[in-house]
Amino acid sequence: MATKTYYFYVLLCADGSFYGGFTDDVKARVATHNAGKGAKYTAQRLPVRLLYHQAFADKHDALSAEWHFKHQTRHRKEVFLEDHQVEWR
């Protein structure tokens, strides 16, 4: 039986804000966000662009990564992205 992979991802919204999320299909989830059918937050800040994603074998670990990102200050989110060599500016 194949194991399922879960992802934590970070989007850059049109207003320059970051959005952290969780999914089992990054490509489909980003398309859903850009169709305005994702989170209310991103629907009001279209379009969004995928900046980063990280795979996890365990759902809890992916959800934990999302929770920790969402509870950081803007500065700490920027540091996280820079530490992962993500160009977003």
UniProtKB/Swiss-Prot annotation:
Occurrences of domain GIY-YIG (ranges): 4-79
UniProt xrefs under CDD domains: GIY-YIG_UPF0213
Entry's family note: Belongs to the UPF0213 family.
Protein name listed in UniProt: UPF0213 protein LSEI_1587
Provenance organism: Lacticaseibacillus paracasei (strain ATCC 334 / BCRC 17002 / CCUG 31169 / CIP 107868 / KCTC 3260 / NRRL B-441)
